[in-house]
Amino acid sequence: METASGPQEKYQLITRNLQEVLGEDKLMAILKEREVKIYWGTATTGKPHVAYFVPMSKIADFLKAGCEVTILFADLHAYLDNMKAPWELLELRTRYYEHVIKAMLESIGVPLEKLKFIRGTDYQLSKEYTLDVYRLSSVVTQHDAKKAGAEVVKQVEHPLLSGLLYPGLQALDEEYLKVDAQFGGVDQRKIFTFAEKYLPSLGYAKRIHLMNPMVPGLTGSKMSSSEEDSKIDLLDRKEDVKKKLKKAFCEPGNIENNGVLSFIKHVLFPLKSEFVILREEKWGGNKTYTAYETLEKDFAEQVVHPGDLKNSVEAALNKLLDPIREKFNSPELKKLTNAAYPNPSKAKPAEKGTKNSEPETIVPSRLDIRVGKVVSVEKHPDADSLYVEKIDVGEPEPRTVVSGLVQFVPKEQLQDRLVVLLCNLKPQKMRGVESQGMVLCASSVGEPRQVEPLDPPAECCAGERVYVEGYEDGEPDDELKPKKKVFEKLQADFRISEDCIAQWKERNFLTKLGSISCKSLKGGSIS
């Protein structure tokens, strides 16, 4: 990584794309004498999303400017903020953040050896730090503490004392990390000015504060971990990235509150110094922009179409996400992710036989059904009636699926076809080949038996979820236990309607693009 030379060049790198700097003169004075020490902290709460690339790209700028950069995993802050991270999950979430932030930095080419990583609890539970918390609490008013956290700490009618402590701890971090400057979003401004007011009262120096703008989410508001359509998760599949970008607010010619343009400005341009608009030759072919202002001007004048802008962002974003997805595909990190962010709907069942135990709920949302694309079909080496298919369901590798369709569907009709796959059956070997799912098909009633694979809408992507109308919000089981016979109990009410639509209890099987159907077997069963 090349570094800037000279105080002015370093200053430009440190401050580019920032919304505000408190302490500009002090920053320049330090740059004339030595390298600047900066820290960025992140509370280990919800899953990081693609907006985290905004601070990551600035951290890359800081390193190019020769700064000494510390990344703080603020685990104690995560607990203090209205218990956004429960105490029992604190360690797991901190480990998750460490892995995902490092994967993001590696994805954009930041050398990790140039960074210092530290957890809040490594020093915030020390005797000295704790004494300073008490000293600070003796001079800070309740009004100032509440005001400082208003944009950051979760606001409730009756705030907990922990939320009032939060700004003071963040202020003390500047002293205990021995930095010249703290970097964060402009939503942290009140905490930064709080620190500037109160640290000197303890005899500590006032620090420089560097503030990023808040990047609009895809809906045009702040990108939020709690608004599913507003954010793109770092581990989202390519199909989900496409789907969320497709929904993004990006009105032709409108450059105000445009989350897609904002992401290009604050993430993609700083990382590559250029951005390529991908489009067909008949629309002018690809065009490379070396200045964001030129791209914004062309979009405002409708020279660049929103569809081309979204497709180009999708391609660039997936290049950043691919190495992160690959890293988190390991069994260890999959296990960590599930442990750090357990499914809240999966409450611990009552003890069997206790008076609080209830019959298990059998609902279709427990089935993990997805659209799949058949990428290859071969005859089973040891069974004439079976196919062995490779089916893409939006995972890093296609699944191997064994199907008894040889007598009903010619091989060439399966190749490259979209199918509907049940993905959470327990894998089982069929004549020596492990099958990792089941292709759902319509079957005729009576003889001669006819079988047709179910058809999703033609525009669907591999991996897209299939659900039953009215049950779209439930979470599927990780794996269906054979002894529970969940699928078998639900399957008893699967039917093909008179309109050839797949149904459960007269409720349609759906994707976001429409109904699941079959070609002709009205009134048939589904298996």
Swiss-Prot record:
Q: Where is this motif: 'HIGH' region?
A: 44-52
User: Per its UniProt entry, which superkingdom is the organism in?
Assistant: Eukaryota
Q: In this protein, which residues make up the domain named tRNA-binding?
A: 363-467
**Which leading EC class covers this enzyme?**
ligase
Sites binding L-tyrosine sit at 39, 166, 170, 173, 188
Listed under GO biological process in this entry are: tyrosyl-tRNA aminoacylation
**Known catalysed reaction(s)?**
tRNA(Tyr) + L-tyrosine + ATP = L-tyrosyl-tRNA(Tyr) + AMP + diphosphate + H(+)
Q: Does the keyword Metal-binding apply?
A: no
Keywords tagged on the record = Aminoacyl-tRNA synthetase, ATP-binding, Cytoplasm, Ligase, Nucleotide-binding, Nucleus, Protein biosynthesis, RNA-binding, tRNA-binding
Where, by residue number, is the motif 'KMSKS' region? 222-226
Show the domain comment. Answer: The nuclear localization signal, which mediates localization to the nucleus, is also important for interacting with tRNA(Tyr), suggesting that it is sterically blocked when tRNA(Tyr) is bound.
Could you give the subunit structure recorded for this chain?
Homodimer.
Provide the protein name.
Answer: Tyrosine--tRNA ligase, cytoplasmic
What organism is listed for this UniProt entry?
Gallus gallus (Chicken)
